[in-house]
From Swiss-Prot:
GO cellular component, one term: CENP-A containing nucleosome
Biased composition (Low complexity): 1-13
Positions of post-translational N6-acetyllysine modification: K7, K12, K17
Domain of life (superkingdom): Eukaryota
Source organism: Kluyveromyces lactis (strain ATCC 8585 / CBS 2359 / DSM 70799 / NBRC 1267 / NRRL Y-1140 / WM37)
Location(s) in or outside the cell: Nucleus; Chromosome
Extent of the signal sequence: none
Gene name as annotated: HTB1
Protein name from the UniProt record: Histone H2B.1
Keywords: Acetylation, Chromosome, DNA-binding, Isopeptide bond, Methylation, Nucleosome core, Nucleus, Phosphoprotein, Ubl conjugation
Family annotation (InterPro entries): Histone-fold, Histone_H2A/H2B/H3, Histone_H2B, HISTONE_H2B_site
Coiled-coil regions listed: none
Sequence position, cross-link Glycyl lysine isopeptide (Lys-Gly) (interchain with G-Cter in SUMO): K7, K17, K18
Pfam families to which the protein is assigned, alphabetical: Histone
Role played: Core component of nucleosome. Nucleosomes wrap and compact DNA into chromatin, limiting DNA accessibility to the cellular machineries which require DNA as a template. Histones thereby play a central role in transcription regulation, DNA repair, DNA replication and chromosomal stability. DNA accessibility is regulated via a complex set of post-translational modifications of histones, also called histone code, and nucleosome remodeling.
Lineage: Eukaryota, Fungi, Dikarya, Ascomycota, Saccharomycotina
Length: 132
């Protein structure tokens, strides 16, 4: 028993200091080029619609940016509303029905009617093209 009493508590040795790793800048190394982050926009689609309706009309970059923000905003509103509708009905999938109801709730009057009819037409066209 005297052996246990004479045993001293283990002392902790200080951690060894490691030399600091050299920081290599990726901007100085030409072999590692940094790819630019791509930004998803609706610009090409907006431009195509513009040329279908007004072939001789152009659009400025600022106007394109505003329209792109508008499309993103409407998309987000419809997605959020349709997500809520799916949750209310205890469904985990957003279907065309939820999208259509969300459009009716978000867009006012005549605009909602036109949007629903165009959306239905687009879905029908897509369905017929995938079956063929």
């Amino acid at each position: 028993m005297s052996a246990k009493a004479s045993k001293a508590p283990a002392s902790k040795a200080p951690a060894e200091k490691k030399p600091a790793a050299k920081k290599t800048s990726s901007s100085t190394d030409p072999s590692k080029k940094r790819t630019k982050a791509r930004k998803e926009t609706y610009s090409s689609y907006i431009y195509k619609v513009l040329k279908q309706t007004h072939p001789d009309t152009g659009i400025s970059q600022k106007s394109m940016s505003i329209l792109n923000s508008f499309v993103n905003d409407i998309f987000e509103r419809i997605a959020t509303e349709s997500s809520k509708l799916a949750a209310y009905n205890k469904k985990s999938t957003i279907s065309a029905r939820e999208i259509q109801t969300a459009v009716r709730l978000i867009l006012p009057g005549e605009l909602a009617k036109h949007a629903v009819s165009e959306g239905t037409r687009a879905v029908t066209k897509y369905s017929s093209s995938t079956q063929a």
